[in-house]
């Protein structure tokens, strides 16, 4: 149905007591103008009725278990969905189809697939919420360009965390170019990425940067084992492969701690020329005596204190002569450690990999991808067991704050009313005033220009430190004013603030803003001249 006729169709649907409508049509908010008006009208109809709408500008959905496929994606023709406990929620129909297709090729069963498009009504947050509440869903993959209802989105992520269901999230629009593309695609305003990053982390979802990583992590959740620690054990037949994985583990914040000395001695007794530290190298003796594999792994799990193990077997596991004996050895090794996660990095045929999977052993070819997937499982283990601290919200103070840019002195006075004590100075409006307040102190003074038009004082020469005498203070006062007039001639100057120097400690920056999506947020990080250079801040 063309966009200009959709509103009439939706109105007719309401008259016939329809409960849901799926709108494939494009030509709405994503093109602006008249399309935006059409979409607003659809939203109004939903608000005034019991109708729920998916879309417009979406590719539909499916339920593989009930074989319900209201979608026009061509992927269904090429790959009939395999029912499973993984589901997909995507704002983009085409990219949602891409995620489904590569999932199918990976052998992952997808139960529900939902694309939300422009979200005149149903949002991706609501879709995640529905999936999190469904007992038939264990893992959720989500593609998000923007969030319109921050509270709803947070509640969905929190529901999934409480249910111990991994949410693997691809949030795009990180760059200015990407954000602009998102806006033209589904009329999405991407928002400040640093805030999204913190929301995702704080509420237990795992953010990925690629489809490959998304699929790897979803695949790794199949055993439903989420370690609560970050200690990684590596067993390998290749010293080089072990080094590669150790580096990758360091990159993602995992610990590759050495085996205890007693355990190392026992490993040496089994294979004198083995490397018993961690990575544990079983060497080529592996080919002659596979019984060393369960012995090594047992020592690693019983004495090494590792929360998960990755085994690097390269193409050996794919050998017809070695694949089954190795699998038998791994089954023996893990028979007493069903609560531990073990990931194989190996190169083998699809049949061999599936055979290993049926026995509960994951297989990821690239060892660094195996490490990243293990890190994701450990991340979920940490988040699923994280205690949520309840914050006592104080009633707001009734303070009259002027609706204009405030200078530094005014800001300090307001913050003091909230019991935030800062290094308050004196405002000087002429050089003669310095004599009235200057006293010799050990650490000296700092002088700063005060202007609501100047955010970064260093850039305009508006600050001077370590002032140790009255004459120097008078000289610096004149220098600061001259610097500012030269470099920022249009700035309105309220004066110069003089404060005692404070040495030692760490200079920090603290800020607050009302985000249009998530509401009030607080920013904290490294302050001073390093704020813009290092950008070491968190929300």
Write out the residue ranges for each language-model feature.
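Catalytic-core regions of core metabolic enzymes
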Residues: 1-539
